[in-house]
C-alpha cells in the first residue's frame, strides 16, 4: 500500500497557477522540482557525488539529490541531480518579439508569392565559416525537409540553392550576387567560444562594406540563435530550435513583399 506521500488528501498542495510567480512543475503546482544533468572531471565515487550536490546547492537548488552517476571514462563522471528551485519568474513581465504571428503552409506561401511578388524568389543558404554541419541547413532547404515539413526546394515559387557547409562568407556573398538572390539563409550549428557570433558578424561587415546589406533579406538559424540575437547582429530575423521551412518562408516572402512596396 502507498504511504500516502503523494496523496492529495493527506498533504496540502498548491493547485493554482500564479503567472506572477511561475515555478517549475514536477509532481504538483509550484513545487519547483527540477532535474539537472552535468559532467564533472572527477572519478566516479562518493566524493564526486558530494561535489555534484554542492554545485547544485551553489546554483540555488534546495535539498539536491544525486539520483544517477555514471562513469564516462576513468576521470569523468556524468550526474543527474534532482532539487527544489525556490525562486520564481513573473510571466506577465516577459515580452518576446515573435518572428511570425501566422505561419503559411507551403501551398499558401506559393500562392502568396504568385499574388504579391509575381515571380519566383531566389533563396541561397549555407553553413558558413568553418561550420561543417549541414543538418540545420538541410532541414530547411532540402526537398524532403524535416519532421513532416517540406524544405524550400519543394516550393513551386522558390528557387532554393543549398551551398552546403564550410562556405566562406566571401564566397557566400559572391554566389548570392551571381544567382541574384532575394534571401540569404545562414546556418550556424557550432557555437563553442561564440564562434557563431563572430562569423555572423563578419558576414554583416562584409555585406555592409560592399554596399549589399539592403539588397537581401538576411536570415540566420541554429540551436543557439533566436530572433533577438539575430536582430542585434544586424539580421532581419533569427530562427532557433523548433522552427521549420514554413517559418522561414513565411517571414522571407512577407518581408520581401513589404520592401518591394515600401
Curated annotation (Swiss-Prot):
Residue positions where N6-(pyridoxal phosphate)lysine is found in the record: 144
One matching Pfam family: B12-binding
UniProt pathway annotation: Amino-acid metabolism; lysine degradation
Catalytic activity: (3S)-3,6-diaminohexanoate = (3S,5S)-3,5-diaminohexanoate; D-lysine = (2R,5S)-2,5-diaminohexanoate
Residues involved in adenosylcob(III)alamin binding: 130-136, 185-192, 219-223, 239-244
Protein name: Lysine 5,6-aminomutase beta subunit
UniProt record similarity statement: Belongs to the KamE family.
The enzyme's E.C. designation: 5.4.3.3
Gene giving rise to this polypeptide: kamE
Source organism, top-level taxon: Bacteria
Major enzyme class: isomerase
Purpose of the protein: Catalyzes the migration of the L-beta-lysine and D-lysine epsilon amino group to the delta carbon to produce 3,5-diaminohexanoate and 2,5-diaminohexanoate, respectively.
Domain B12-binding: 120-262
Cofactor(s) required, per the database record: adenosylcob(III)alamin; pyridoxal 5'-phosphate
Record key words, sorted: Cobalamin, Cobalt, Isomerase, Metal-binding, Pyridoxal phosphate
Keyword Transmembrane helix: no
Originating species: Acetoanaerobium sticklandii (strain ATCC 12662 / DSM 519 / JCM 1433 / CCUG 9281 / NCIMB 10654 / HF) (Clostridium sticklandii)
Description of how activity is regulated: Rapidly inactivated in the presence of D-lysine and to a lesser extent in the absence of adenosylcobalamin (Adocbl). Activity is stable in the presence of Adocbl when D-lysine is absent. Adocbl imparts thermal stability at 37 degrees Celsius.
Quaternary structure and partners: Heterotetramer of 2 alpha and 2 beta subunits.
One example GO MF annotation: cobalamin binding
Amino acid at each position: 500500500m502507498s504511504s500516502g506521500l503523494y496523496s492529495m488528501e493527506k498533504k496540502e498542495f498548491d493547485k493554482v497557477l500564479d503567472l506572477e510567480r511561475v515555478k517549475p512543475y514536477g509532481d504538483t503546482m509550484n513545487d519547483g522540482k527540477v532535474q539537472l544533468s552535468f559532467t564533472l572531471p572527477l572519478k566516479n565515487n562518493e566524493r564526486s557525488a558530494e561535489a555534484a550536490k554542492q554545485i547544485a546547492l551553489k546554483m540555488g537548488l534546495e535539498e539536491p539529490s544525486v539520483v544517477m552517476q555514471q562513469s564516462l571514462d576513468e576521470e569523468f563522471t556524468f550526474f543527474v541531480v534532482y532539487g527544489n528551485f525556490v525562486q520564481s519568474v513573473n510571466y506577465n513581465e516577459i515580452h518576446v518579439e515573435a518572428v511570425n504571428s501566422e505561419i503559411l503552409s507551403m501551398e499558401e506561401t506559393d500562392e502568396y508569392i504568385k499574388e504579391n511578388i509575381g515571380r519566383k524568389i531566389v533563396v541561397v543558404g549555407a553553413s558558413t565559416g568553418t561550420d561543417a554541419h549541414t543538418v540545420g541547413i538541410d532541414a530547411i532547404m532540402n526537398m524532403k525537409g524535416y519532421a513532416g515539413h517540406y524544405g524550400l526546394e519543394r516550393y513551386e515559387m522558390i528557387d532554393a540553392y543549398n551551398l552546403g557547409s564550410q562556405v566562406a562568407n566571401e564566397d557566400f556573398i559572391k554566389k548570392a550576387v551571381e544567382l541574384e538572390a532575394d534571401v540569404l539563409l545562414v546556418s550556424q550549428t557550432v557555437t563553442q567560444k561564440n564562434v557563431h557570433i563572430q562569423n555572423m558578424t563578419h558576414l554583416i561587415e562584409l555585406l555592409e562594406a560592399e554596399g549589399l546589406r539592403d539588397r537581401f533579406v538576411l536570415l540566420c538559424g541554429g540551436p543557439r540563435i533566436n530572433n533577438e540575437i539575430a536582430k542585434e547582429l544586424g539580421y532581419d530575423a533569427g530562427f532557433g530550435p523548433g522552427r521549420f521551412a514554413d517559418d522561414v518562408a513565411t517571414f522571407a516572402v512577407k518581408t520581401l513583399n513589404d520592401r518591394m512596396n515600401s
